[in-house]
């Protein structure tokens, strides 16, 4: 995938979740709901501050993140993959193993 996000934008691939119902039935896809976790595929150079300096992003390629799946998060299809384009501010946490 050849894509380079600009500024404080981040490209994330949503991770599939598997959950079970109260009866033990495995729910996948739309029945399980959309995951708000994903893997960072690409990051921009950083956020431009008011003084013109560029602040590097805290997230890096390969990080597993929890994100806000709301307004401002754009879904795109690239190389037959659905990816999300978001600002770093839409990322709530980095999952550390």
From Swiss-Prot:
It comes from Cronobacter sakazakii (strain ATCC BAA-894) (Enterobacter sakazakii). One of its GO terms (biological process) is chaperone cofactor-dependent protein refolding. The keyword Chaperone applies. HAMAP family: CH10. PROSITE patterns: CHAPERONINS_CPN10 (PS00681). The keyword Phosphoprotein does not apply. This is Co-chaperonin GroES. It is found in: Cytoplasm. Pfam families: Cpn10. InterPro entries: Chaperonin_GroES, Chaperonin_GroES_sf, Chaprnonin_Cpn10_CS, GroES-like_sf. Transmembrane segments: none annotated. NCBIfam families: PRK00364.1-1, PRK00364.1-2, PRK00364.2-2. Together with the chaperonin GroEL, plays an essential role in assisting protein folding. The GroEL-GroES system forms a nano-cage that allows encapsulation of the non-native substrate proteins and provides a physical environment optimized to promote and accelerate protein folding. GroES binds to the apical surface of the GroEL ring, thereby capping the opening of the GroEL channel. Belongs to the GroES chaperonin family. Heptamer of 7 subunits arranged in a ring. Interacts with the chaperonin GroEL. One of its GO terms (cellular component) is cytoplasm. It comes from the Bacteria. Keywords: Chaperone, Cytoplasm. GO terms for molecular function: ATP binding; metal ion binding; protein folding chaperone; protein-folding chaperone binding; unfolded protein binding.
């Amino acid at each position: 995938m050849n894509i380079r996000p600009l500024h404080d934008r981040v490209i994330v691939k949503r991770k599939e979740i598997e959950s079970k119902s109260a009866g033990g039935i495995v729910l996948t896809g739309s029945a399980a709901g959309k995951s708000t976790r994903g893997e960072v595929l690409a990051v921009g150079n950083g956020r431009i501050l008011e003084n013109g300096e560029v602040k590097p992003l805290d997230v890096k390629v390969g990080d597993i993140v929890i994100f806000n799946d709301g307004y401002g998060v754009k879904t795109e299809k690239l190389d037959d993959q659905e990816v999300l384009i978001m600002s770093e501010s839409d990322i709530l946490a980095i999952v550390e193993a």
